[in-house]
Swiss-Prot record:
This is LYR motif-containing protein 9. Signal peptide: none annotated. It comes from the Eukaryota. CDD domains: Complex1_LYR_LYRM9. InterPro entries: Complex1_LYR_dom, Complex1_LYR_LYRM9, Complex_I_LYR. PANTHER family: LYR MOTIF-CONTAINING PROTEIN 9. It comes from Danio rerio. Belongs to the complex I LYR family. LYRM9 subfamily.
């Protein structure tokens, strides 16, 4: 289950971009937030010209699962 509501509704690269930026707000420190926001922007810009629908869906699924993993890693109670 995704930590941020709406992951199942992500269908386009722009929706993914917005979803991932919302996920960043859940990270514990501002430095982490800035780091991952920068990484998200870089990745978005590097894939902006992708036009294969299957490849786009693969990227979306992978990005959501990676975001879930990162949020679980940093927000897990010890």
């Amino acid at each position: 289950m995704s930590p941020v509501a709406g992951a199942k509704f992500v269908r386009t690269p722009l929706q993914l971009y917005r979803y991932l930026l919302r996920c960043c707000r859940l990270l514990p420190s501002e430095a982490m937030q800035k780091h991952y926001q920068h990484a998200i922007r870089q990745s978005y810009n590097s894939h902006v010209d992708e036009d294969d629908p299957q490849r786009i869906q693969m990227i979306i699924q992978r990005a959501i699962s990676d975001a879930d993993w990162i949020l679980n890693k940093y927000t897990k109670k010890k």
